[in-house]
Amino acid sequence: TLKRNDIPFDEGNYQMIEYLDSYLISDTKKVKVKDIGKKVALTNSFFFDYLKEYHIPTSFLRIDGEASLKFSITKELPFRIKILNSADKRNSKIFGIKEGTELNLPVFEFHYGCGKESLISESHLIAFDLCTPEDMKLITRICSKINAVLKSFFERRNEILAEICCHFGKYEDKVFLIGDFSPASLKIFPKDESVKWTNPYKLSSAAEVKKYTEHLFNIASVK
């Protein structure tokens, strides 16, 4: 997980998020990675602006400083949606297929909390008043569009979008994408299996985190 500082709302009801040069690779191990905060901030800025071109609502306003982003005020919804286009370790074991196998249709997983048993269903979210049925339909539609846009983006660059994790917030009656495009939430790998690559599911050292972060940054930097 990328470490960050959430700076309190200012008088204009904006929030600043500062990305730090450290990464939590396990519950007990944090590594320092030079310039990772700046590169993740720039990568995030690129993808937020890119999705805006496709009329996807986001709370992102602009980059503000070397490693900080400015967002409009929202109340973060207490769950996240993990979109899978390839079988991850958990699903490959359940369904008896090779890890990394591309799926015919995306799988939407809903997660609540940070524990290992975070996977829940849509009905959990509605039953426990964490989301209304109307907002759930809207969020699912937005996720489908995000996945289609980014999957196509990476395919054109000979990359496979294996997974993306989306976080949402609300302001008044509107829903906004609020994050995130960090190494922890965006998993890609090359179409060409002969290409040497860093497995985003197995980032266990500062060097691996740096290499994968730079890979995402370089893709976002290519115009």
Predicted regions span which residues?
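C-terminal helix-cap and adjacent tail motif
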Residues: 181-223
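Active-site loop/lid in soluble adenylation, ligation, and acyl-transfer enzymes
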Residues: 1-112, 220
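ATP-dependent carboxylate/phosphate-activation module, predominantly the ATP-grasp catalytic core
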Residues: 93-138
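A short beta-strand motif that forms the metal-chelation/ATP-contact edge
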Residues: 166-190
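A long amphipathic alpha-helix within ATP-dependent nucleotide-binding catalytic cores
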Residues: 130-162
